[in-house]
Amino acid sequence: MSFDLAFWHQKSVPTVEEAAQIYDQLVDGLSGVVEANSAVEDFHKAMISVFPDLAEENMDESPWTSPLYVTSECVIATISWSRSGEVPSVLLDLASRHGLTTYDPQEQAVYGITGEASTR
């Protein structure tokens, strides 16, 4: 079992409905959904320095159930449920430090750069 978190740069924190639309488009592989931003690449580098991307060599200890989905616009992580107590808080902190919005589609929650959630 796993769950997703999505990260992107946006000047203002979107509503849950807006974030859900953005997430759906990003998951569908559309580009131009949000502006590309170097903060996304910087976040990705910081993220894989803590939790390396899934590879054959680290499958047993990786928190990811599939390789990270990374573009110039977003990072989408599919996290193993067994690591749900540890990984999200680290990623939320990193995202906040890089000025990124985080969307949790399971909880329908949006986290802005303050790390505070807004939900339906």
Residue ranges and their predicted role:
Residues 1-120:
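Acidic (Asp/Glu-rich) sequence patches and key acidic residues
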